[in-house]
A protein has these predicted regions:
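Condensing-enzyme catalytic core mediating Claisen C-C bond formation in acyl metabolism
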Residues: 5-9, 36, 215-290, 299, ...
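Conserved catalytic cysteine-centered active-site region
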Residues: 1-3, 37-80, 111-174, 183, ...
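Active-site-proximal alpha-helical scaffold in enzymes
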Residues: 78-91, 141-144, 149-152, 157-193, ...
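Acyl-CoA/ACP chain-elongation machinery
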Residues: 39, 183-229, 262-274, 304-311, ...
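Glycine-/small-residue-rich "gating" segment that lines the acyl/pantetheine channel
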Residues: 125-132, 170-173, 177, 194-250, ...
């Protein structure tokens, strides 16, 4: 039996560069950073005091205040992005939609860390009897999917993946396969994160993973630049509506792009330090799944976190996977503007990769002041200015702690 084709019919996102897709995309193309000093809590005793915070976000646009108070902020972001994507797709207006065939898979790398932190403080101050009865369901990672299914009445597969910073990519790739293999006709898929808290920022700072460029937040995230000194933590959510092609055509849905490949791998090397073989294997497997060659790739939305080791390693991995063609590909890191959204990043960067294909534009990688050629970072990173380009095939890379890797392949749709 031939596999069914899967297309993207809806996009939604909440991020440091905007609380809807169009605002975020416009800001990315303009090279506007969403990174600033932390306002969410007093970070004065942490050496990294900067973050890509979501600003001016109103969950009341999506659910009631009573409901919102019962859940952590990462669930807020996930619900908002999901409802945006569903609205964009026109699913609510579809006639005779079989909701038994619509599922949701929106994951998170960390989950309800702010709620866990606040509840821990409550217990220390007043004992276990003061724990909010909504603490557990308000912190669980699969509850983004759970809330969306309840809000929309979807009775297809519902779960939430957890694989550190590869979560969003894994959620999307896994969901596409559910459709290909006939387990669903539509999947709402992506990732969400809201870990800008004392524990979240302090934990990564203790690992010496974060940038300490507190005097100039907007230039702190600088992938492949010689002066990069760590990543900048971010937050938000990115969600796609994935749909079986004939199902989408039948209801006259607009189609942004087709998802044609998904590859996964493990480094089998180190909990936090990367190696090039694992990521290269994910790219190679994704292209094989898509039935494409390295020479077919036009654009890479790279993991590109702005860490000294990670950026050089990903460049090596791309050279290993794409060979000489790696020098002809646009390699872009939107994290230079959003920061690193952890488990949400595969979702938001999938949104941006789909838009790169649909709009035939690459956002810039900002803050490349002196490209780190000495470390081998010598590819075309679309430095500092957006670019019109022929982008028929885009890949999106996500790598996470534990050596988990995921690559998605998106292709310009043609009947």
């Amino acid at each position: 039996m031939s596999q069914r084709r899967v297309v993207i019919t809806g996009l939604g996102q909440v991020s440091p560069v905007g609380n809807d897709v169009q605002t975020a995309w416009n800001n990315l193309l303009s090279g506007r950073s969403g990174i600033g000093l932390i306002t969410r809590f007093d970070a004065s005793d942490i050496n990294s005091q900067i973050a890509g915070e979501v600003r001016d976000f109103d969950i009341g646009q999506y659910i009631s205040g009573k409901e919102a108070r019962r859940m952590d902020v990462f669930i807020h972001y996930g619900i908002a992005a999901a409802l945006q994507a569903i609205s964009d797709s026109g699913l609510d207006d579809a006639e005779n939609l079989d909701k038994d065939r619509v599922g949701v898979n929106i994951g998170s790398g960390i989950g309800g860390l702010p709620s866990i932190e606040a509840t821990g403080k409550t217990v220390l101050e007043g004992g276990a009897r003061r724990i909010n009865p909504f603490f557990i369901p308000g912190s669980l990672i699969n509850l983004i999917s759970g809330h969306v299914t309840i809000l929309k009445g979807y009775r297809g597969p519902s779960y939430g993946m957890v694989s550190a910073c590869t979560t969003g990519a894994h959620s999307i790739g896994d969901s596409a396969r559910l459709i290909k293999y006939g387990d669903a006709d539509v999947m709402i898929a992506g990732g969400a994160e809201g870990a800008i808290s004392t524990l979240g920022v302090g934990g990564f700072a203790a690992m010496k993973a974060l940038s300490t460029r507190n005097d100039d937040p907007a230039t702190a995230s600088r992938p492949w630049d010689k002066g990069r000194d760590g990543f900048v933590i971010g937050e938000g959510a990115g969600v796609l509506v994935l749909e079986e092609l004939e199902h989408a055509k039948k209801r006259g849905a607009k189609i942004y792009a087709e998802i044609v490949g998904f590859g996964m791998s493990s480094d089998a090397y180190h909990i936090t330090a990367p190696n090039e073989e694992g990521p290269a294997l994910a790219v190679t497997r994704a292209l094989k799944d898509a039935g494409l060659n390295p020479e077919d790739v036009d654009y890479v939305n790279a993991h590109g976190t702005s860490t000294p080791l990670g950026d050089a390693n990903e460049t090596k991995a791309l050279k290993l996977a794409l060979g000489d063609h790696s020098r002809k590909v646009i390699v872009n890191s939107t994290k230079s503007m959003t920061g690193h959204l952890l488990g949400a990043v595969g979702g938001v960067e999938a949104v941006y990769s789909v838009l790169a294909v649909h709009e035939q534009k690459s956002p810039p990688t900002i803050n490349i002041f002196e490209q780190d050629i000495e470390a081998g970072c010598d590819l075309d990173y679309c430095a500092n200015e957006a670019r019109d380009a022929k982008i028929d095939v885009a890949i999106s890379n996500s790598f996470g702690f534990g050596g988990t890797n995921g690559t998605l392949v998106f292709k310009k749709f043609s009947g």
